[in-house]
């Protein structure tokens, strides 16, 4: 029974705000590259010391409006039914979302970022710096995911 799983407790760090969001859609799905705001609770502002040294951040959040009972979902690319642990679906037993967001600027306890994939008002769980040498796995694949289009070379 999914409802008998133990519940973990954590402190919300604050909330995310999708700037110019389309109602009901995560910011990235609504408009790629849209800016978002991470509003950190003032009690955690000291934890932002040094954040300006990171160009990109892992942002973890609680997908508070996502159903938690779903264990299998069809994937959007091919419609094949898969377990949620094999997908990036927000519908999962512990609806934890993650995005790699570009840090644009810090204003006190607020971070302006680009690349959030969550609804306006989504509770923040954690923020970590993106480490290129540790977080990028060359050659990693997911067999059912279409290969990304090649990045064109810059014009001379």
Per-region residue spans from a language model:
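Single conserved hydrophobic/aromatic residue that forms the stacking wall/gate
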Residues: 1-7
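Well-ordered alpha/beta subsegment
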Residues: 98-118, 149
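Short, compositionally biased
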Residues: 71-87
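Short coil-to-beta-strand transition motifs
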Residues: 4, 91-100
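Short, well-structured hydrophobic secondary-structure segments
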Residues: 31-72
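Flexible glycine-rich active-site/ligand-binding loops centered on an Asp-His dyad
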Residues: 116-146
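Charged phosphate-binding loop/patch that engages nucleotide di/tri-phosphates or the phosphate backbone
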Residues: 143-156
